[in-house]
Amino acid sequence: CYFRNCPIG
C-alpha cells in the first residue's frame, strides 16, 4: 500500500 490507494489499509 502507499498513500490512500489501499482498500483496507
Swiss-Prot record:
Protein purpose: Has a role in the neurosecretory system of the vena cava.
Q: What is its main location?
A: secreted
The protein's name in its UniProt record: Cephalotocin
Family the UniProt entry places it in:
Belongs to the vasopressin/oxytocin family.
GO MF terms listed in the record are: neurohypophyseal hormone activity
GO terms for cellular component: extracellular region
Localisation per UniProt entry: Secreted
Its domain of life? Eukaryota
Matching entries from InterPro entries are given as: Neurohypophysial_hormone_CS
Q: PTM Glycine amide: at which residues?
A: G9
Q: In this UniProt entry, which cysteines form S-S bonds?
A: C1-C6
Keyword annotations of the record: Amidation, Disulfide bond, Hormone, Secreted
